[in-house]
A protein has these predicted regions:
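Signature of N-terminal electron-transfer/Fe-S-associated modules in redox systems
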Residues: 1-160, 164-186
Length: 186
């Protein structure tokens, strides 16, 4: 019996047609499997390998290399909080402390008692100009404050399942440079 639904397996089988190299489909395929199950089981990785006609060791290698793939159960809503230098200097540690207290966990990766939330500290999400920031349910959230965290938690407690991503984040545009670049005269 398959652990992945027929619909997800069909989506996975269609992925290679979207990429110039067949193997490039493995990450979106693993993402589909994880979205359906909540995390990647050995059986799910095997089914992804079979559906993509790839070596199971390759699929497992990709799943274990990238931190956004999970091999054990996580909360329904996963907070990835950037704690790299830019975010740390703008309050990421306070955001992490507030989040941990609000969801009732003590460690990175721990699941809240109600099973709804987990968090993980990550090195960089590529939006330093919006620090502190995080990714939640495939969406980026910027300029975080404890109040924004509380609002997101309240919203997610009402949500039956994580929303599918539509765009990258909150619609923010990067700040313009503080001064214009000039060509060096040579």
């Amino acid at each position: 019996m398959s652990v992945l639904s027929a619909h997800v397996l069909e989506e996975i089988r269609e992925l290679p047609d979207k990429y110039p190299q067949h193997r490039s489909a493995v990450m979106p395929a693993l993402d589909l499997a994880q979205e359906e199950l909540g995390y990647l089981t050995p059986e799910a990785m095997s089914e992804v390998a079979t559906a993509l006609q790839l070596d199971p060791g390759y699929v497992e290698g990709v799943a274990t290399f990238y931190t956004l793939f999970h091999l054990k159960p996580i909360g329904k809503h996963m907070f990835y909080v950037c704690t790299n230098l830019s975010c740390m200097l703008r309050g990421a540690n306070e955001i992490v402390d507030h989040l941990k207290g609000a969801i009732g966990v003590h460690e990175d990766g721990e699941v809240s008692k109600d099973g709804l939330f987990s968090y993980e500290e990550v090195e960089c999400l590529g939006a330093c100009e919006f620090a502190p920031m995080m990714r939640l349910d495939h969406r980026f959230h910027y300029d975080l404050t404890p109040e924004k965290i509380d609002a997101l938690l309240a919203e997610r407690r009402q949500s039956p399942s994580p929303p599918r991503a539509e765009g990258q984040g909150e619609g923010r545009e990067p700040a313009p440079p503080m001064r214009k670049r000039t060509k060096k005269s040579g």
